[in-house]
Amino acid sequence: MSKADEKYLDIIENILENGYYDNNRTGIETYKLPHQIMQFDLSKEFPILTTKFVAFKTSVKELLWIYKDQSNDVRKLQNENVTIWDEWMLEDGTIGKAYGYQVAKFKQIDNLIDTLKTDPQSRRMLISLWNIADLKDMSLTPCCYETLWDVQNGKLNCMLVQRSGDMPLGVPFNMCQYAVLVHLIAQVTGLKPGLFTHVINNAHIYKNQIEGMKIQLKRRDKAYEAPKLWINPNIKNFYDFTADDIKLIDYKHHDKIKMEVAV
């Protein structure tokens, strides 16, 4: 069994058994738990679920849209056949001053890469998408809103802080795509990928997702080993990466589990 399946399904079981039943802004009740944490050693294994299909290529395209293209334009994703942001698209075709807009506004990727190269022991390396002044102009405030970076013995560590985690749908995307981000940043800074820690402040399962999660839990004993991540070794500039430069090798998985996203 992959570490991703093991740690993820442990949280799912905990929420279903011990979660607090609550209302929220969507109108669909949730079972939730605070402060859930998963940690993966990226030098040993790539974290993606095998107990259900995760649309890895779509998650990579979204990641590059945010951090490489530094875009808030949903139409760019649609041109890549990615529709996951359609529900939050505003009349101008964007999601407002959210996600990639904040990366570009403060040149956050450039600053991170420069610091990793010139002052890798800095304790001030972080990317924040939570700009209080612009929250009112975002169609959706960022769920994965902060990453903190650290270097130890030539390995790049990253902590992802997620304020709100839709465990069945959002979190499987986020855990693998931010692991990819660590690999990409490590490659262009001459480092090796190290620890990836995923902190979820509010980990929840919507009431209409419970049956789907029970199906996935039944697959625990039939989980597969983790696939290998391949990144084009010739890419040395972060902005040269494309989705075709990032692939999974031997990704074995169970079938997709259809569940609805709460808007």
UniProtKB/Swiss-Prot annotation:
Pfam families linked: Thymidylat_synt
Any one of the GO BP annotations: methylation
The enzyme's E.C. designation: 2.1.1.45
Active site: C143 (nucleophile)
Keyword set, alphabetical order: Cytoplasm, Methyltransferase, Nucleotide biosynthesis, Transferase
Domain of life: Bacteria
A GO term, aspect molecular function: thymidylate synthase activity
Enzyme class: transferase
Gene3D superfamilies: Thymidylate synthase/dCMP hydroxymethylase domain
Residues reported to bind dUMP: R25, R123, R124, R163, S164, G165, D166, N174, H204, I205, Y206
Cellular localization per UniProt: Cytoplasm
Function field: Catalyzes the reductive methylation of 2'-deoxyuridine-5'-monophosphate (dUMP) to 2'-deoxythymidine-5'-monophosphate (dTMP) while utilizing 5,10-methylenetetrahydrofolate (mTHF) as the methyl donor and reductant in the reaction, yielding dihydrofolate (DHF) as a by-product. This enzymatic reaction provides an intracellular de novo source of dTMP, an essential precursor for DNA biosynthesis.
NCBIfam families (alphabetical): PRK01827.1-1, thym_sym
Protein name: Thymidylate synthase
Gene: thyA
